Amino acid sequence: MASSPERNDARRGHKPRQQGHFSRRPEPVADDWLWGWHAVEAALANPRRGEPELILATPERIKQIQAKFGVLATVQQADNQQIAQRLPQGAVHQGVAMRGAVLEDADLGDFVGGPGAVILMLDQVTDPQNVGAILRSAAAFGATGVVLQDRHAPRFTGALAKAAAGALDKIAVARVVNLSRALDELTDAGWRAIGLTGDSEQVLGDVLDGRPTVLVLGSEGEGMRRLVAEHCDELAKIPLPGGFESLNVSAAAAVALYEASRPRN
């Protein structure tokens, strides 16, 4: 059931008013926009998001926003061309874009481990499309969260959010300074760390045992760094019977998450 406009306005601190119309004056493209219906819808529903500065939407999208979230004072009506002016060239915005809703990072302590729980840790995976796809898989398979390094990881831009198809706001993401120390903290809290590498003799399916698990994936070119691998409890590989040497990191994450989601005795 949709929330009433008045209740949503009270919750968000807005006074209901008529939707404004976006000015036709072009402004510089900014990199703090989210676009696409799934990304914007998930962001508006996420309590870890700050208040948006501006939402540009076509009349049809405004109706959808009002039906689900009530009347928001930050919404302005715009046509597709006006929305596209604010976004990177080629952005597929589907008639809606949102600016300025900052996403709060999760803390490692927020990740509660139970039987079968899985965290993904990404070691220097820098491509926004890959990270977005990994977040989407993590949300689809019910992962507890994702851990990134605060450097050598992409910012949460609109391109990443679009690739994640709303998953950026449906799964907790923690950014840490040092992955090795983060692994120590998680293992002290009862998590078991398994690093994925094609050099291992062990197969992932044989190493997983149903305990709370951190799956660590490295970049496609370099893989996991040595120090990160040394802080894992086990190293394992994804078997590739077709003879191909490796998978794209987002594909590897999806396969690993599927394997981890299978019931185990």
What annotation goes with each model-predicted range?
Residues 113-202:
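RNA substrate-binding interface of SAM-dependent RNA methyltransferases
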